[in-house]
Curated annotation (Swiss-Prot):
<protein>
    <recommendedName>
        <fullName>Mediator of RNA polymerase II transcription subunit 6</fullName>
    </recommendedName>
</protein>
<feature type="compositionally biased region" description="Basic and acidic residues">
    <location>
        <begin position="166"/>
        <end position="184"/>
    </location>
</feature>
<dbReference type="InterPro" id="IPR016820">
    <property type="entry name" value="Mediator_Med6_met/pln"/>
</dbReference>
<comment type="function">
    <text>Component of the Mediator complex, a coactivator involved in the regulated transcription of nearly all RNA polymerase II-dependent genes. Mediator functions as a bridge to convey information from gene-specific regulatory proteins to the basal RNA polymerase II transcription machinery. Mediator is recruited to promoters by direct interactions with regulatory proteins and serves as a scaffold for the assembly of a functional preinitiation complex with RNA polymerase II and the general transcription factors.</text>
</comment>
<keyword id="KW-0010">Activator</keyword>
<feature type="region of interest" description="Disordered">
    <location>
        <begin position="207"/>
        <end position="246"/>
    </location>
</feature>
<dbReference type="InterPro" id="IPR007018">
    <property type="entry name" value="Mediator_Med6"/>
</dbReference>
<comment type="subunit">
    <text>Component of the Mediator complex. Interacts with let-19/mdt-13. Interacts with RNA polymerase II. Interacts with mdt-28.</text>
</comment>
<keyword id="KW-0804">Transcription</keyword>
<keyword id="KW-0805">Transcription regulation</keyword>
<feature type="compositionally biased region" description="Basic and acidic residues">
    <location>
        <begin position="208"/>
        <end position="224"/>
    </location>
</feature>
<feature type="region of interest" description="Disordered">
    <location>
        <begin position="165"/>
        <end position="186"/>
    </location>
</feature>
<dbReference type="GO" id="GO:0070847">
    <property type="term" value="C:core mediator complex"/>
</dbReference>
<dbReference type="InterPro" id="IPR038566">
    <property type="entry name" value="Mediator_Med6_sf"/>
</dbReference>
<dbReference type="Pfam" id="PF04934">
    <property type="entry name" value="Med6"/>
</dbReference>
<dbReference type="GO" id="GO:0006357">
    <property type="term" value="P:regulation of transcription by RNA polymerase II"/>
</dbReference>
<comment type="similarity">
    <text>Belongs to the Mediator complex subunit 6 family.</text>
</comment>
Length: 246
């Protein structure tokens, strides 16, 4: 008879769901598919049960057969490598009833030397539903504040307290200016103003304009020679008109 499968108990699932295990004595790049089970089956691992079949094999020091072959001939809690794609390894915790019948209990993934418990379907769906329902609950609570009822009009909306977009932009602008002011201290402001006043005193704007005018007068632009088109062709004097006699 197969054991009844259902959502795991929250009292057993919640503590280990947010836990992790890491053995500092094992470098992360040293872990591969051949020794990942040895890394997982550690007494300090919170996900590892000491009464499992893997622990019995380690205590008996069986070396003439592979671990998978030994586990197929044993019954009880077992840990097997389910998937391998370095640096990711997935370990399955299962209950073996006979040589051909196993019931998965939980999955764990090992990545870069850290062991974490994979969420089951019940926990995953519950988390997604809570993540979707919480914004809806906040939205309905916000909408309820603007709902009004009148015997003549019935239900209607009233958004008098809703701030306008222009006001929001002004508040945002003031906040940005306030942040810019907070970046400098009073000493820095006073020091900057003193340096600017000193520069204006040493190099006033009027003297700079006068010097610029003097330079332009000292270096007058050379007169351009008139072009041939402006001079035109030479004109000859016309002969005096002959006197007419009657």
């Amino acid at each position: 008879m197969m054991p009844r499968m259902g959502p795991p108990s929250s009292s057993k699932q919640e503590p280990t769901m947010f836990m992790s295990f890491r053995n500092p004595q094992w470098p992360a790049n040293f872990i591969n598919r051949d020794n990942v089970l040895d890394y997982f089956c550690n007494q300090g691992n919170v996900f590892y049960e000491m009464n499992s079949c893997n622990q019995q094999i380690k205590m008996q020091n069986i070396t003439n057969r592979s671990v998978d072959e030994c586990l197929r001939n044993m019954q009880g809690i077992q840990y097997v490598l389910w998937y391998s794609q370095p640096p990711l390894y997935i370990v399955c915790k299962q209950r073996r009833n006979n040589a051909t019948n196993v019931s998965p209990i939980a999955y764990y993934y090992v990545i870069n030397g850290s062991v974490h418990q994979a969420p089951d379907m019940h926990t995953l769906v519950q988390s997604r539903l809570l993540g979707a329902l919480e914004p809806l609950r906040n939205a309905f609570g916000e909408v309820t504040n603007y709902s009004r009822y009148n015997t003549a009009k019935g239900y209607y909306w009233e958004f008098k307290n809703k701030p306008s977009m222009k006001k929001k932009e002004e508040e945002k602008k003031e906040e940005d200016e306030r942040k810019l002011e907070e970046r400098s201290t009073n000493f820095q402001k006073a020091r900057t103003m003193m340096l600017l006043n000193q520069l204006f005193t040493e190099m006033p704007a009027d003297e700079a304009l006068e010097k610029l005018d003097v330079k332009e007068e000292e270096n007058p632009k050379p007169e351009e020679a008139p072009s041939a088109s402006a001079v035109g062709e030479p004109k000859f004097a016309e002969p005096a008109a002959r006197a007419t006699t009657k």
